[in-house]
Amino acid sequence: MEIGTEISRKIRSAIKGKLQELGAYVDEELPDYIMVMVANKKSQDQMTEDLSLFLGNNTIRFTVWLHGVLDKLRSVTTEPSSLKSSDTNIFDSNVPSNKSNFSRGDERRHEAAVPPLAIPSTRPEKRDSRVSTSSQESKTTNVRQTYDDGAATRLMSTVKPLREPAPSEDVIDIKPEPDDLIDEDLNFVQENPLSQKKPTVTLTYGSSRPSIEIYRPPASRNADSGVHLNRLQFQQQQNSIHAAKQLDMQNSWVYETGRLCEPEVLNSLEETYSPFFRNNSEKMSMEDENFRKRKLPVVSSVVKVKKFNHDGEEEEEDDDYGSRTGSISSSVSVPAKPERRPSLPPSKQANKNLILKAISEAQESVTKTTNYSTVPQKQTLPVAPRTRTSQEELLAEVVQGQSRTPRISPPIKEEETKGDSVEKNQGTQQRQLLSRLQIDPVMAETLQMSQDYYDMESMVHADTRSFILKKPKLSEEIVVAPNQESGMKTADSLRVLSGHLMQTRDLVQPDKPASPKFIVTLDGVPSPPGYMSDQEEDMCFEGMKPVNQTAASNKGLRGLLHPQQLHLLSRQLEDPNGSFSNAEMSELSVAQKPEKLLERCKYWPACKNGDECAYHHPISPCKAFPNCKFAEKCLFVHPNCKYDAKCTKPDCPFTHVSRRIPVLSPKPAVAPPAPPSSSQLCRYFPACKKMECPFYHPKHCRFNTQCTRPDCTFYHPTINVPPRHALKWIRPQTSE
């Protein structure tokens, strides 16, 4: 890697010097761009076309020089690169069945197939049980082809050319690099040690790729451990030596490794070794899973495989993948293909931080927008501190003495602020008492009324201390039986009327999820009638009807009582005999909200108040139209006027959507008093010029002298017209 980086750096510095010589060097981006073109194997013509914008007339001179340098580099690297083959040429070639078949001509053919400047192949490797793929896993030469910015290629091999003269047993040992992470879940050798008396074939999964270790008895393993260390040291020293032996060595190893998959060898192994995996399909599934995890290359030590003593004819490896089913648990794996480098310079690549930031923000937004639970809206009302009074204690004693009935009052929960310890203790005792006893609904209603009465009185005081109130739960309303006595019905109606405040106060639960809180501090000022919703108003005016639990509980703390309602409520509570009748309540309701007037809204159909308008909006068509005498004041629908706002007819029976501008009728002209008529013809007529002449002046005929009617009664002036000849013009004679 260091040699390739050094070559790339030298090429880049040479390009930079050449650009400075030509006077075209501006910054570091142009040499980087040229290095990218070199990495992409651009031809001289393509480079000339791309660099003409930057170099101008010196483009051809520069590209000729650059390609000359690259050709020299290729000629220098041809000799070392011919010593080894690329991954495709080495491992995709058919493996011969005999060692003698691999001749020097084949070696020369492999050398010729290696390009001088090679890029790692991005073709997906095959994952089958072929010997060629098996040899790719534990190959003799660890070809590391590094192309740094496309400048040069360094073909580096770590070779194990040594052969043992006669090793007692064979070891294929592929070990991960020391900085690789070891998958502890798949390390079967250390977690499942087998008996030392019996040699076992164990499949060990490392971090980057699966490897095979054929374990021997402990004696032979200890003897060979030092040999492995020596070979690993010798491997680092042999980088470019013994090139001629590499292909022969590799072919021999491939040949011997291929024999491991032959049926005769497998049968003998099954007799001698106990396989760790009995189920071959399970082993292959684990190989596939581990193949997806491979990312990094490994440092492998390759030792010649000992020949098994078989006199039978050696067979070529079968191409079918299914031929390995039922065989011993040997691993055939493919090294991970090199990671593809982007061709763009780092300055033009996408910023990974932006992508990661966008992903994290998207995840945060998803987690924030989900899991919202509905929390009732809270309102802060001024409440004076209250203490338990003698009346409240008396009511509690009455509740204790009540006989139990089948009706159960729902439990009421209350938590007061920590500062008001007296209120908390007393309220808790009372609520527990109500929840334990089966209370008669009338008594529970009376108790609730008395408690709420003090709430109301404390609200009347101008105390600005605020407690956060919450909408009551559905279980806090008490159903009133229709056959109770009139005093209790009045109390229930008052409870419904004042249902905005007469709910149990609750402290805000700290464990509830956060939600928008609208805290409004009302310093003893009741809300105006306009702020009440329609449902609340309807609730106020239908207070005489028995209220079911759900409808009453939905009202909640939506507003405050009107002053008139507070006065009415205090009168009812002060009346011990309950003589305050329902009739007075209904009178109050009617007085508060007048019914709709039986008068048509003058803004209809463009009225903005809609159903809230106090005037009548027509719905059904008028049956008397167009003879309806009410015109625009009719309570039924009339058709639209085609003139709409431009209509000037004051009593137009049609409907006008736009507002008409009232047209003032012109003031009638006062006719002058008629002079006394006289049948005597004015003597000065038609030349009379007196406007108030009392005499008769005949009316002129509009056709004047051209009138042809002999019986025309109008006046025709008698004008003496000159004769015809007098109207003829003659040119005067001029004397010559």
Curated annotation (Swiss-Prot):
GO CC term (a single one): nuclear speck
GO molecular function: poly(A) binding; pre-mRNA binding; zinc ion binding
Protein name listed in UniProt: Zinc finger CCCH domain-containing protein 14
Keyword Secreted appears in the UniProt entry: no
Polar residues: compositionally biased ranges: 78-103, 131-145
Modified sites of kind N-acetylmethionine: 1
Span of zinc fingers (C3H1-type): 595-620, 621-640, 641-656, 682-699, 701-719
Region: Disordered, residue numbers: 78-146, 310-350, 398-430
Organism per entry: Macaca fascicularis (Crab-eating macaque)
Cross-link Glycyl lysine isopeptide (Lys-Gly) (interchain with G-Cter in SUMO2): where in chain: 99, 139, 175, 198, 245, 283, 295, 357, 378, 413, 489
Protein's cellular compartments: Nucleus speckle
Gene (name only): ZC3H14
Gene Ontology biological process terms in this record: mRNA stabilization; spermatogenesis
Pfam family, one: zf-CCCH_2
